[in-house]
From Swiss-Prot:
Function: An accessory protein needed during the final step in the assembly of 30S ribosomal subunit, possibly for assembly of the head region. Essential for efficient processing of 16S rRNA. May be needed both before and after RbfA during the maturation of 16S rRNA. It has affinity for free ribosomal 30S subunits but not for 70S ribosomes.
Protein name as annotated: Ribosome maturation factor RimM
Free-text note regarding domains: The PRC barrel domain binds ribosomal protein uS19.
HAMAP family, A to Z: Ribosome_mat_RimM
Taxonomy, superkingdom: Bacteria
Length: 165
């Protein structure tokens, strides 16, 4: 399992005092409020303040004190250690842990590896690219078992839930 998570990407500067504008890579941006320290390029950095602006997070990070300083951090990722990540509710998983899991149907037919997880308003969707592109809705009646330790997910046979149109 990954021990370091990307939780955001610095996309721009904000103001003249070294704040950075962050595109969050997490559904719950309120998680940023709980952060005390993050990693940028493998270096520990203390968070001094967190604000929100539309769909972005504005961070003041210790050691980034001018707009010129902040400019050098554009496109860099903000990461945290798994041990600092918030605890998940039962039956939920970090996307980073799902990516790369092999998906099988209940008949033990291999469907492929999860390439990405797409978040939609109603439910997440597992995206498999190989050997054949397949989008699997993450619903309790379709996803039967998730075994993160063994990187294995079992779903109902596709013919039972996919439209043939």
């Amino acid at each position: 399992m990954e021990e370091i998570f990307k939780i955001g990407q610095i996309v721009n500067t904000h103001g003249i005092k070294g704040e950075v504008k962050v595109y969050p890579l997490t559904e719950d941006v309120n998680k940023f409020k709980k952060l005390k320290t993050v990693l940028i390029d493998g270096e520990h950095r203390n968070i001094q303040s967190v604000k929100f602006q539309k769909d972005r997070v504005i961070l003041k990070i210790e050691g980034i004190d001018t707009m010129n300083d902040a400019e050098t951090y554009k496109q860099k990722y903000i990461e945290i250690f798994r041990s600092n990540a918030p605890e998940l509710e039962a039956d939920t998983h970090y996307i980073v842990d799902l990516i790369g899991c092999m998906v099988y149907d209940a008949d033990n037919m291999e469907l492929g590896k999860i390439f990405d997880v797409i978040s939609t308003p109603s439910n997440d969707v597992y995206w498999i690219k190989q050997p054949k592109e397949l989008l699997i809705p993450v619903l309790k009646d379709i996803v039967l078992d998730i075994d993160i330790e063994n990187k294995k997910i079992v779903v109902k046979p596709v013919r039972q839930w996919q439209d043939e149109d």
